[in-house]
Design a protein with these regions (language model features):
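C-terminal motif of bacterial Sec signal peptides marking the signal peptidase cleavage site
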Residues: 18-20
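Low-complexity, acidic Ser/Thr/Pro/Gly-rich terminal tails and inter-domain linkers that flank the onset
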Residues: 25-50, 87-91
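Short, well-ordered beta-strand segments enriched in hydrophobic/aromatic residues
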Residues: 52-61
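Solvent-exposed beta-hairpin/edge-strand motifs
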Residues: 67-88, 128-138
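Short, solvent-exposed, Trp/other aromatic-anchored flexible loops in extracytoplasmic proteins
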Residues: 84-129
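A non-transmembrane, solvent-exposed segment enriched in polar/low-complexity residues
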Residues: 89, 137-342
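Oxidative protein folding and maturation machinery
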Residues: 167, 256-521
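Conserved redox-active cysteine motifs that mediate thiol-disulfide chemistry
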Residues: 519, 523-531
């Protein structure tokens, strides 16, 4: 109650303060801004009095959770002058501000009067605040931003929409992702992530890439074949897809002013500042048509199917399969009727086939997940029992052989799920009579690659086995093996630890053998990769 009364009193005092000098006030309603690293707060109004700058803040956050405004918060004008925060009205600085049921709230922040003639200001909680709120380029003189200067490389090249998709080659080499964060400002996140979906393993980790002071960035990677990547500048609202290919450069420009506009409470319906990202590189036309592609898939996919879980597992599995097949056919028909380029159509037909195959592979798990959602409070034993029942009911011929043919098509490697299929190759090949082809070669390469990733260098026998693989696969494996050997040699030179050999023991006796050397002592044991 005391907190509510204090907040109410502060709001009244603030209103009196503003009303007392209203004739001299200058008010900017819903000012446009350049960029923001948050959707939790936005400036809804700026009031310039003869002595203060008051920001009305609209807050939007998860209901019953809190946000906080640090006492280190300050404004910086267009000449570089700083104005430290003086007080909050309706919010106490450095204290938790709990969001109501609606998830929306308003309060005011008071700063010194900005310099006369200021064109804009930046808002920051300060570099010392981890995850602090930052808003750049809040406009005071205009309801428009300065013109966005587009690099020449960003201008789309003319392409023939009738050209078919260039068949991805299985080759090895360095691929480069480079580009620029447009409108990059001091204080913006100084790194972004590149997430790689390797045709051999699927998700292959993400890499932090530093951003230079002018907003440019560049990263090179060893890659086998054409791979799907995500350039992720998450705090600034940019998440864009690119393709990388050995020997080629993938160039991407990130438009953070547009990314911030579409996330804005007050400006998302306003005039666009262009695309969120621009791309030049492999499969350029597919990326250029990405928005149309996403809209087409969303419209043709249809509603999420529901199931009567009182039916037998065999019936549920057949209903699920029919729904997935029907969905794929609807999407293929939509693709054929679309005005997309032939390259995008070729890419999409491969993508649809891969998504269908992946969906059928995961049928027991997906149905179990829907069953769990329908039941809501389900304990783990019931969940696992249902999942086991679905797996047992899965017939051997559930996935038609014709659907597996896509795995031997090079276009399949462009899909992010291809690497996951390669990881499951042993299971797929045991369950189905797979024809020899691209997939079996990638599966053999993948098995050797996983060993290297598990810190096991290639043996002489494996190197001999490797000779049956395409040259690109051999080059990739040898390069990864050399990296591992170099790492192992470097680790041998480290000190401060001792490696103990377990010796030749049966699997069931391994742990007992390891700890036997330390009998009577306290041990910290770290178990990992137990699956």
């Amino acid at each position: 109650m005391k907190t509510i009364l204090r907040s109410t009193l502060m709001m009244l005092l603030g209103a009196m303060l503003l009303a007392g000098c209203a004739k001299d006030n200058r008010i900017i309603e819903k000012p446009v801004f350049l960029a923001s690293n948050t959707t939790s707060i936005e400036v809804s109004k700026v009031t310039l009095t003869d002595s203060t700058t008051v920001l009305d803040i609209f807050a939007r956050y998860q209901p019953k959770y809190w946000i906080r405004i640090a006492s280190s918060t300050y404004l910086t004008d267009d000449k570089g002058n700083d104005y430290p925060i003086q007080s909050g009205i309706g919010i106490e600085l450095d204290k938790e501000f709990w969001m109501p049921e609606s998830g929306e709230a308003e309060f005011k922040l008071v700063f010194p009067r900005l310099r006369n003639g200021s064109k804009y200001f930046d808002f920051s909680e300060g570099a010392e605040v981890s995850g602090g709120f930052n808003i750049w380029g809040v406009q005071l003189k205009s309801n428009e931003l300065s013109e966005l200067k587009l690099p020449k490389a960003m201008l789309a090249q003319e392409v023939d929409k009738e050209d078919p998709l260039e068949v991805p080659e299985l080759k090895y080499g360095k691929a480069t992702v480079k580009g620029q964060v447009l409108d990059y400002q001091p204080g913006m996140p100084a790194a972004l992530k590149i997430v790689v979906y390797n045709p051999l393993v699927g998700y292959d980790g993400d890499m932090d890439v530093n951003i230079e002071s002018d907003g440019t960035f560049e990263h090179s990677m060893d890659i086998l074949g054409v791979a799907n990547c995500i350039v992720y500048y998450g705090e600034m609202g940019v998440n864009t897809e690119v393709f990388v290919e050995p020997g080629k450069i993938s160039e991407v420009f990130l438009n953070i002013r547009e990314a911030s506009r579409v996330r804005s409470k007050f400006h998302y319906n306003g005039e666009s500042y262009g695309k969120v990202s621009y791309y030049n590189g492999p499969l350029e036309i597919v990326i250029r048509e990405k928005q149309e592609i996403d809209e087409l898939l969303r419209a043709s996919r249809g509603e999420w199917a529901t199931y009567d879980f009182k039916k037998k597992p065999e019936v549920l599995l057949e209903e699920y399969k029919k729904n997935e097949m029907d969905k794929a056919n609807r999407m293929r028909e939509a693709v054929s009727q679309s005005t997309l380029s032939q390259s995008s159509k070729d890419y999409l037909n491969g993508h649809i086939s891969m998504q269908l195959l992946s969906g059928l592979q995961l049928a027991p798990g997906i149905l179990t997940g829907q069953y769990s959602m329908a039941q809501r409070d389900m304990d783990r034993e019931v969940y696992m029992a249902f999942h086991t029942k679905m797996i047992k009911a899965l017939p051997d011929n559930y996935i038609d052989k014709s659907l597996l043919a896509i795995l031997n098509e090079p276009v399949a490697m462009l899909d992010g799920t291809y690497g996951e299929m390669v990881r499951q190759a042993d299971m797929i090949q045991k369950s189905h009579d797979m024809e020899e082809g691209l997939f079996t070669l990638m599966a053999k390469t993948g098995n050797l690659y996983h060993g290297i990733k598990d810190f096991m260098p290639l043996t002489d026998a494996q190197k001999e086995e490797m000779k049956s693989l395409p040259e690109a696969c051999q080059q990739y494996l040898m390069a990864e093996n050399d990296k591992l050997l170099a790492k192992l040699e470097a680790n041998k030179k480290k000190s401060g630890f001792r490696v103990n050999e377990a010796g030749e023991v049966a699997n069931e006796d391994l742990f007992a053998s390891i700890i036997s050397k330390f009998r009577g002592k306290v041990l910290l044991v770290d178990f990992w990769a137990t699956w």
